[in-house]
Structure formats: C-alpha cells, structure tokens
C-alpha cells in the first residue's frame, strides 16, 4: 500500500526531527531536511568574512542538527553511509522543494501558532494528495489544520514518534475527523513495514495516549513517595525491572527526559483537561519546580534527581537528591527484604503478584501507585482510545514496560484487586464493572494460539487481529505445531516448508540441550523441510555459551585447559556443520517470512 512513498521532507532539525530523518533514511527513503536560517553570525563565521547570505551560514542550524544525529548514542543511523540519503536546506530558500516529496513531517517547536504559520507556507508548495503529518506530542491535530484547504485537511494527521525514533517502537497515529481512511492506512502500513514501528491509533485528545497515562502515573508516584516518606532510591528500586519496567525506573527516566520537559508537558496537560477527575495530581510538587528554577533538569544539566561527580582519586561517584533538604547525598543501595526476596523469583508475573499484595512498605507503595493507575487509565476509555489493546500497546512500546495497563490488571487478578479497591473506598470504573457483570474475570483470553480482548462496545471478547506477515512463536506453539522440544530449545513448524529453531533457556544461553536440538534440527530440516529460521522473540537472542554446561555436557572435567580447548573445538565444528545446513536451506527457500516480536526494542525509556 505504501509503495508510493519514497521521498520524505522533515521540517525541523532538532533532536526529534533529525532522528526521524535518520530513521527514514535507514529505511531507504530519500529525505529533505529543512530548518530556519540563523539571524546572527557566530565568531567563526565573522572571522571567515561570511555573511547571513552565505550558504554555509544559512544551513548552519540544519547541518548542525544532522551532524548531531550522526554522533548521537545510541546511533540514529544504521550505517554512516545512510546519511547520504539526506539533503539539507532552509525554509526560506528550499521549502518549494516539498512539491517533489510524498510525505511531509512537521517536527518544529511545540507552539501552535508557529506550527500553523509553517504549515500555511507548506500548503503553497505542496502538491495535491501529498500526506502531511505533525510529530507534536500533544498539540491538537485539528487545531493545526483549521483554515487549511479541503485537500490539505484530508491528507493531514498526527504521527507522534517516541525518542529515540530508531529504538522505541511506538508510533501514535492520530487522524482528525477530516483525515481520509486510506491516508491513515497508508501511513500505518509504511511505518509498520518500512520503519519497523508499532502502530497505535489514538484520538485527538491532549497528550494522546502514552504521555497522558505516563504523566499521571509519574506524578502520582511522586505524590505517594512524599506522603509515605520514601526516598528517590527506594522508588526507583520498586519501579524498575522487579516489576517488568526498564532499569531507568522512575526518576532516572525523568533525568533522561529532562525535568523541565516533563513539567512543561504536565502543565500543558493540566490546562487542557479541566474535567479530568484526577486533575489535582497533574500539579507538580514544589520541590520539582524548585529543581527547574535551579537548573537541576537532569542529565543534560549534569544533575537532576541524580548527580554524577568525581570523588577521591578521580573515581566516579553517584549522588541522589534528598527532596526534603534539597541537598545531594551519596546514593545508597536499597535493601528491603521483600524486594531482595522477589528478585529471586524468575517469573515476572509471580514477582509482581507477590510484591503488590505485600504487607510492607513495598506492597503499600506498589498497591497505591498501580491501583490508581489502573483506575485512571480505565476511565480514559473511550476518551483517548476505543479499546484496551491500543492503550496497552502504547504503554509497552512507548515506555518498554513488559505489561500494558490492562495486561497488568490481569496479572494481579481483576476480582482480587477490585475487592481490595472496594475495601480502600476506591470507585470502580464503569468499564471494569461491565467486565465483572458479564461474568468475565480477565481483560484478555488466550485460546489455541489466538488472543481475545474485552471489547467495551459489545461487552464481549473480540479477537486481536493478527498482523499480516508477522509470525508470533507463542501462538504457533499453542497450536501444537512443536516438532520437538527440550528444556532449552524447540523446533517449530511455521508452515510452507519452513521450520524455526527457537532458543528458550535462561537468557537463551547456549548449552548442551541447545546444541542437541541444533543437531536434531539439521537432520530433521534436511529430510522434511525446505528452510530453517533460527530465531526467538526474547529480549536477548542469546547471551552466548553456557561454558559450564557445555563442558559438563561433554563429560569432561572442568578446569583443565586441554579439556576446555577440546570441548570448544568440537562444538565449533558442530556449529560450522549446523550453519552450513542452515545456509543451504535458506538459499533453497528464499527470503522467507517476517519473524518479529510485538514487544521488541527494549532500549531504554523516555517521553516522546
């Protein structure tokens, strides 16, 4: 469907604009990157005798944005060569070139009047039928298009990328009442298939889906922290990997985003939602406002909730803010018995259930924050989205959470949690009451490799539509298509003469069982299949060899170099044979199908 989009214009070369341009180039699209011209010369330009009319001066801002994207970590480009697909220019001289592109993406400063002025200029040169979108994180899409031509409004929508665009999977697509359905479908198809994004369809409401929920969630956690006398280190220890969230947890995430940015988003949201039943939570506490006044805005300022400095002997040491005294102190490792015990539980579901219903400080904090977030998010349907699937995907893909809001509700148990909410005097959302009144006990059901979600409109389960061309191994296995398995690996029949060797040991480390299944797969695929895919849908493809298990599996004694070398040599030979067999199968079959994880790209978490 998206075959006609081959050239893109990105308007704005700031952090987001330049990285969006980079990722479009990664997908093989030609990109025109434009920005404003400088109004003053810098010292170096004056020394060279340049003027404001010199091209080097005019393109200074846009070229600097592109150069920053080339150097940013993690890398915005697949390869340095890809940057050659990007051409730079300025609005005053080069805006007419948008007449030759297929998609125009606006990514300038978050001010409605400035965006509208630029889009009005774009309309002078844009050819009819060209798609135009805005990367705004919360300005109403409809307001930007007001007064534009009928053709412009029909081809205009929001496309909210999350930072960094290459790594965070989420793309919120926000149509208006005027946007043509085929335009929405074309952008969604392009961004899914070529840009690798996870598409969520949001309504044109303040901050859309992900940032609406995240703003409430983060500020509510701060409120619970203050009321309960928790430290910043304690909160981060309770809101990170132990509950299926990134290592950056709560406050390290805000340091990455920038506290000034986070408060700007919160203040705009507060002004835009006068009828929000929890609007009071959107008011940041005084200590956070004071941090911004002092310039303690996070990593970009060198200090925020955390501060890194050189200690004695040049050793790096980390400090953390005491929000009561507004002084930094050495960060302490958090030691809470229930947290330490929970870390020994491998299963995230069981770990969360254990912690959230705990009777200690950890349980109290997690219950108060999670229950409030569940209720708040449930009350946002149908305001911000029509179904729970789009909301859950926005939370997972935008912030790298293992579970979306309604998936998390299933994890802790709908009936059990609702009973506790009632004990606490909390009001149960109509959506949840409707679920329970219908006799259902969960928001999702899984049957024979298919996933169903509770549909608010019908009050019944509705199947989550499978994505064409995407294979989900869990679903395939639930359809009893496993040829053979052991504790570390499985051989799965994908259909069409293709088998898949999936690793599923702890962290997908390769041990004796994995190699045994490799050897079996070579023989089985050679006799009964056309091709073999080696893949899995875990966070790690493989962390490498489990040397201890490999050695034990060979029957050799551990600790002697000659035995170690012999074992490795033998395994290298087996791996070579295995690889050659896979190559033969792949060359016979061709490119094969897409094998991709819905929840991949867990590379950090930050607001878009």
Give the positions of each predicted feature:
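N-terminal glycine-rich phosphate-binding loop for ADP-containing cofactors
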Residues: 2-539, 547-580, 587-591, 599-601, ...
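Conserved divalent-metal-coordinating catalytic cores
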Residues: 596
